[in-house]
Regions:
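Compositionally biased, proline/threonine/alanine/serine-rich low-complexity intrinsically disordered stretches
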Residues: 240-248
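Positively charged n-region of N-terminal signal peptides that target proteins for export
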Residues: 1-5
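Short, conserved active-site entrance elements at the starts or edges of catalytic domains
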Residues: 113-151, 170-175
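N-terminal mature ectodomain segment of secretory-pathway/periplasmic proteins
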Residues: 22-99, 131-138
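Acidic/charged, solvent-exposed loop-and-adjacent secondary-structure segments enriched in E/D, K/R, S/T
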Residues: 92-121
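N-terminal signal peptide c-region/cleavage motif recognized by signal peptidases
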Residues: 13-15
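Gly/Pro-enriched, hydrophobic low-complexity segments
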Residues: 18, 71, 77, 143-238
C-alpha cells in the first residue's frame, strides 16, 4: 500500500507542472478572446507611434499576414524607414537614413528576430508543435501585481520569461535572453493598456529596453485592424535602384 501511494504521489508530481502550465495558458488564451478568435486572424494592421527618447516620436505602421509575412514602416525626419520585412523564408530592410537608398537582406540574427515577430499567434500557442518548452516557475510580484512566472525556451535556444497577471490572466511583462554575435543580450518588455478589438484583447502600450543600453522604446498603438486586405507585394523585396552613370 505504501509503495502504491508513493508511486501515485510521484506520478502526480510528474504530471502537475505540465497540467499547471496548460491550465495557466488556457486561461491566458481565453482572456485574450479565445483560441478560435485568435486563429481566425489572417492579417493585421497596427498603427501607432514609437517614442525613441525625449521629444523623439515617429509614426509607425506594422502589417502582418499568416505565412510569416510582417512589415514595419517608421516615418522619421521626413523619410520612411523600413527596419524589418519578412516574406516567408526571406527578409529585407530599407534604411535610407543610413545612407543606403537600396534594400538589404536581413542578417541571420535579424531573420531570427523577424521570424519570432511573424508568429501571429505568439510562441505560447501550440508551443509544443513549434518546438518550444514552457515551465511554470511559481508566482512572483511584478511592480506589486501577482503574476505567474513562465519560462519559455524557444526552439532556437533563446529564453523568454513571461509574467501573466493572476487576476486578468494577461501578459504584463516579458524578459528575454538571446545570443547575439556570440554574446548574451538581455531585455525586458512591459505590456499594458489592454483594449478590446473585434473580440480580441490586445495590449496598446509596449515599453521595451535592453539591459545595459540607455533609454527605452515605447510603442503606443492608436489603431488595430483585424483581417484588413493587405497588398502582398509590399512584402516583396524591391529592386535596387540603378546608379546613374558618372558624367564624363
Amino acid at each position: 500500500m505504501r509503495f502504491l501511494l508513493t508511486a501515485s504521489l510521484l506520478t502526480f508530481a510528474t504530471l502537475a507542472p505540465a497540467q499547471t502550465v496548460d491550465e495557466i495558458l488556457a486561461k491566458n488564451f481565453e482572456a485574450k478572446g479565445g483560441l478560435a478568435k485568435i486563429r481566425a486572424v489572417q492579417s493585421m494592421r497596427v498603427t501607432g507611434k514609437i517614442t525613441l527618447g525625449p521629444g523623439m516620436e515617429a509614426p509607425a505602421v506594422i502589417e502582418q499576414m499568416r505565412g510569416d509575412k510582417v512589415r514595419m514602416d517608421i516615418t522619421f525626419q521626413g523619410m520612411v524607414l523600413t527596419p524589418m520585412v519578412l516574406n516567408g523564408s526571406s527578409g529585407w530592410k530599407l534604411m535610407p537614413i543610413q545612407g543606403n537608398p537600396n534594400p538589404e537582406a536581413l542578417s541571420p540574427e535579424e531573420m531570427k528576430d523577424a521570424l519570432e515577430q511573424a508568429d501571429m499567434d505568439g510562441f505560447l500557442i501550440d508551443y509544443q508543435k513549434k518546438g518550444h518548452t514552457v515551465e511554470y516557475l511559481g508566482k512572483e510580484k511584478v511592480e506589486g501585481t501577482d503574476a505567474y512566472k513562465m519560462k519559455v525556451t524557444l526552439k532556437s535556444g533563446d529564453v523568454r520569461t513571461v509574467y501573466i497577471d493572476t487576476d486578468s490572466n494577461l501578459e504584463i511583462k516579458l524578459e528575454s535572453k538571446s545570443t547575439r554575435r556570440g554574446a548574451e543580450v538581455e531585455g525586458d518588455t512591459n505590456l499594458g493598456d489592454y483594449k478590446e478589438v473585434d473580440g480580441l484583447i490586445l495590449a496598446h502600450s509596449i515599453d521595451s529596453g535592453q539591459k545595459g543600453a540607455p533609454g527605452r522604446q515605447v510603442i503606443t498603438i492608436t489603431k488595430v485592424e483585424i483581417n484588413p486586405k493587405l497588398d502582398e507585394t509590399r512584402f516583396v523585396m524591391p529592386a535596387k535602384k540603378e546608379t546613374p552613370a558618372p558624367v564624363k
